């Protein structure tokens, strides 16, 4: 009898629905490159989001708005390759960048297809409420699963007046609930709820058949998602209220690089153990080499093309 555990089942849109029905929590994180994807997959995440949050976490922008569709395709393809190095279990979702789906349904379908065909994503995520119902229907009819995203939608940061909690009063809470129902009806297979009151997230989750993935939405969602850089503690100066830092990698990286710099300055690195050796290397005096070089014809290094 084999002692190896059975391979873990790939998490697709149907498995996510089953997890909701079974009461199994969904663990999702962001990743932006192959190395991060390989590591989070090995850690056992159920889903990976190639978020346009890379604009802030990787590119150094103040918002997600400058991120382009080409960049999303590029990073998604890297993450797909990283996941392929593991057991291939995690579900891969890519964000649709600002401007890639708002102008027309036709453009949205083309953008979604690129993220799947070129970026290797299994699904796309887009922000917005009922007003994007027709766009979602078109993308789904084209064969691309869509994850919705309501509450705080970072691509609408200027309209919302900043990164603030949404749905705190009765009227806005009702609108979020209406949007959630509309997105489910439009064909979304899952829904991200960002920065809304925990009580509202519980109501939305209980009234939908599709899974809800919370970020800053309390413990009642069917799953949770965090930006990898935040949960790893890579930036000690930025820790939103809803983020729990599960590591302090920022300090660890600074310490490791600082140790490297110190050893280089002290000529302690590289030492003998980190150097290559050969007893058969033929040493040529520098002076002799220079003389031989002067005797070579001018075209010895190759004629210009």
Curated annotation (Swiss-Prot):
Cofactor comment: Binds 1 Mg(2+) ion per subunit.
Annotated binding of Mg(2+), by residue: 52, 95, 127
One GO-annotated biological process of the protein: pantothenate biosynthetic process
Single GO molecular function: 3-methyl-2-oxobutanoate hydroxymethyltransferase activity
Domain of life of the source: Bacteria
Subcellular localization: Cytoplasm
Binding-site positions, 3-methyl-2-oxobutanoate: 52-53, 95, 125
A single Gene Ontology CC term: cytoplasm
Active-site residue numbers: 194
Catalysed reactions, as listed in the record: 3-methyl-2-oxobutanoate + (6R)-5,10-methylene-5,6,7,8-tetrahydrofolate + H2O = 2-dehydropantoate + (6S)-5,6,7,8-tetrahydrofolate
Listed cofactors: Mg(2+)
Enzymatic class: transferase
Similarity remark: Belongs to the PanB family.
Known role: Catalyzes the reversible reaction in which hydroxymethyl group from 5,10-methylenetetrahydrofolate is transferred onto alpha-ketoisovalerate to form ketopantoate.
Subunit structure: Homodecamer; pentamer of dimers.
Protein name (Swiss-Prot/TrEMBL): 3-methyl-2-oxobutanoate hydroxymethyltransferase
Gene label: panB
